[in-house]
Amino acid sequence: MTFKAFFIRSIVLTLSIVVLVVSFNVCMNEYGLFGDVSGKSIKIYGNERTSKYLLSFNYIPANFDGLLIGSSVSDNIDSKEFVGCRFYNASINGTTVAELKILVDNVLAKGDLKCVILSLYPILTESDEKRTTRMVPREYWGSLGSINTLDFYRRKILINMGKMYDYFDEYGRYDYNLRKAGRDSKRLIQKEAERMSPNEPIGINDRAYADLDSLLKAIRASGIKIFAYYHPIPQEYFVMYEQSYRTYKEKLNALFETPDVVWDYNTADFLDFRRDHTNYCDHVHLSRKGIEFITRDINRKLASQL
């Protein structure tokens, strides 16, 4: 065989493999990117940021008319229990407003949302960084065949074999409580309180603050109802930065308008909840008991406003 013939055969073989891989991934449509996916149920098996980014192009707008957005403190909330709309939990572990805005913008471009629930917690506005390089357009085409795609199928196989936790459902909930069962939340809360100093500061990044303002304006411009709540912080260490929290809350409240529904779980009305360590699975994230309480309270507000 001549070098030329070998080269041509190699090119043809390579192209054939590429076509097969792309065709397979289009057929599997694991992120709901292609065609009509209304009525489909798609779970996350790969990286949360990448997955929710890709799902926001088509799957979420095709199947949901409500969003729950926030950081890890709302990531484990079962949004299918909410009333009034079909809510997708688009919260992301350790996220910032800059990342959430990418997801929301994608959904707004194609979807018909009625309602957005925003979980407010200091991590959202402490930085303007995007904490990944994987929420970018190249990931759209990378879903047709890349290292990330291989990792996706590896995780899916291991989860289906029972070798890894099945954390996510088709509503986007990240049920990390599965791995936190049995943790001593009282000890973890006390440890967090010991770590903090009196008058612990809560920083707000200027660009992150502007991102939040831009996000809220974009949601309102689409005629979508905004609900926002301040995540309940365990009282034992909430007192360590209560003064700076007031400043933080006043600044964020200035971004909301009269039609928006905003409330705070760190007021005296919810003191008993925040003193009860069993409402938490660690130092700040909610236990199943805590989630049930918060869900019931949110549903009362949804039922009266939608």
Outline where the language-model segments fall.
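Membrane-embedded segments
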Residues: L68-I147
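Alpha-helical transmembrane signal-anchor/signal-peptide segments
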Residues: M28-S51
